[in-house]
């Protein structure tokens, strides 16, 4: 948030927070000051700008909805556990830092983590055809990066995963998405968490206009409850005959919706 300058609008800040939350962030820090910054010719701002957001800025009142949504989102996104769909294997010869250009095709619209050979040896077990970590995170599939270096020990572990029923995928292959955005997918971002038998999805509209989103849920639940972050209002979504749902998102609005797959 400290990379946002005074010229940035509430919409800009909302996009920053929403994309961060969709990528797994659970906490954001905003530096604020009550003083009006005053740059001088011989004493310019460091890095060419003031590092803190000025509370005397005339746009401060306009920013309040952004902070309110961000705080409520942070509280919700700390509940339960992350529910990633696939685990991306980068190889045995790469740093833990993810290089975007090396990510495989097929992960768009999915929640994912990355790993190297160390995780294969020390962090992953198979349960019911899924990869499971010691802290209870489950992955539906294991996706290998093209041309990844795989040593003999890691290859043996991957072969064992396959024999145990884990879906081993390669670049371009994918799985059925738990949440499939059918319309305006370029305008929204989302992430998925789980509390016991309850699925929690965060969905945010990045646009400064009202967006009507149509989506499909793999579990096809009978009841989907929606909580609007800013207004606090709650309601249920009805499933259409084609097994899709429709949700209207106001400009720069984020929501959470929940359901229990086995609920009657």
List each language-model region with its residue ranges.
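Carbohydrate-binding surfaces of carbohydrate-active enzymes
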Residues: 1-264
């Amino acid at each position: 948030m400290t990379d946002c300058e005074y010229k940035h609008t509430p919409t800009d800040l909302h996009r920053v927070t929403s994309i961060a939350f969709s990528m797994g962030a659970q906490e954001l820090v905003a530096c604020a000051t009550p003083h009006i910054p005053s740059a001088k010719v011989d004493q310019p701002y460091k890095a060419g700008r003031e590092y803190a957001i000025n509370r005397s800025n005339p746009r401060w009142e306009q920013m309040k909805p952004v902070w309110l949504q961000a705080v409520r989102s942070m509280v919700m996104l700390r509940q339960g556990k992350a529910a990633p769909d696939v685990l991306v294997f980068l190889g045995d010869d790469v740093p833990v830092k993810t290089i975007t250009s090396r990510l495989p095709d097929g992960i768009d619209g999915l929640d994912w983590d990355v790993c190297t050979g160390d995780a294969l040896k020390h962090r992953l077990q198979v349960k019911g055809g899924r990869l499971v970590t010691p802290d209870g995170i489950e992955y539906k599939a294991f996706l290998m990066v093209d041309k990844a270096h795989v040593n003999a020990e890691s290859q043996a572990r991957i072969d064992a995963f396959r024999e145990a029923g884990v879906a081993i995928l390669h670049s371009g292959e994918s799985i059925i998405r738990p949440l499939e955005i059918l319309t305006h997918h370029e305008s929204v971002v989302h992430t998925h968490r789980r509390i016991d038998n309850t699925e929690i999805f965060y969905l945010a509209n990045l646009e400064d206009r009202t967006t009507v989103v149509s989506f499909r849920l793999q579990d096809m639940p009978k009841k989907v409850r929606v909580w609007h972050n800013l207004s606090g209002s709650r309601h249920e979504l009805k499933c259409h005959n084609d097994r899709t749902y429709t949700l209207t998102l106001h400009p720069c609005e984020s929501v959470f919706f929940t359901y229990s797959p086995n609920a009657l």
